[in-house]
């Protein structure tokens, strides 16, 4: 379709808002939320990872609300949904789920070099989703927006995404080679092991999935080149606040399925309050206050209200489920 005839997408325009002035226009992904929604619309088993701990014992308010809202929508569409995060973030995530009346089906990500393999083997997800979760940079460290390491407090949950990508690459190589029935598969690919679909949401460049736009990030200066994640995913959603990106996916799921899946502005206020009461802090101010990325609860509630208006705007032709 010619550019002049492309439909105005209100979800994209809301997600592209940049209240933190991070310059996300340089790496924003138009249509990202819709592509993620298409991938998730018929998901069977979803594992959602979230939680960004900015300092020892200080999980931030961005991430768990988005994970809870997206997980609820996917459960309403029939998927089995579980969550994993660091032990320090579990109370915040559980509080967000409780605020929505959702089961706290979450567990602390285990320690150990084989944790990613063990979790994926046990959970057997068809879709792996990250909402505001640190992804390693080129040097292997996890850095905040100031370039300071947060590795001591954030376990390497991105190992699961790296493993999923390696498995997909191995599977594709196996298919291309078209082995005879008598030939064995490479050790890294098990019989019947379907590739995972991977989706991520981020807002700063240092999260899981930002490897998709690393080239654009590194052109933003030396600091961004240091902190930019190398971890890639199938579908990346960039937003001014990561929670908004998750809400954008839910709004698009609603448009695709014709169902009102998004939470309400009142729910949003309760989510933020519940997370703060459970010990979460604002990721920018590092204060225990009812804000997310230095924006008050009313601002986030307004974004939810605006995204909710898009539900009556049908998805692009041919995209409804």
Report the location of each language-model feature.
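Conserved mixed alpha/beta catalytic, RNA-binding, or beta-rich assembly cores of soluble enzyme
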Residues: 63-64, 127-128, 133-166, 195-259
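Short, low-complexity, charge-dense intrinsically disordered segments
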Residues: 172-178
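C-terminal functional extensions of proteins
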Residues: 205-321
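Histidine-anchored nucleotide/phosphate-binding helix
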Residues: 60-78
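Short internal beta-strands
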Residues: 79-88
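A glycine-rich helix N-cap at a beta->alpha junction
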Residues: 97-120
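Positively charged, low-complexity intrinsically disordered leader regions
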Residues: 1-45
